[in-house]
UniProtKB/Swiss-Prot annotation:
Highest taxon of source: Archaea
Keywords on record: Membrane, Transmembrane, Transmembrane helix
Transmembrane segments: 20-37
Cellular localization per UniProt: Membrane
GO cellular component, one term: membrane
Name by which UniProt lists this protein: Uncharacterized protein AF_0236
Membrane topology: Single-pass membrane protein
Organism: Archaeoglobus fulgidus (strain ATCC 49558 / DSM 4304 / JCM 9628 / NBRC 100126 / VC-16)
């Protein structure tokens, strides 16, 4: 599911919308946070 969420921006990046970059950043940050919490 995370992979699918990260693939969405690559499809929508053609629109060159700033929301796409913000969305990708949010997904990446959330995923990294999840990995950090999972380790503990």
């Amino acid at each position: 599911m995370v992979i699918a969420a990260m693939l969405v921006p690559f499809v929508a990046i053609r629109s060159h919308d700033m929301t796409t970059y913000l969305y990708w950043t949010a997904v990446t940050a959330a995923y990294l946070t999840y990995l950090t919490i999972k380790r503990w």
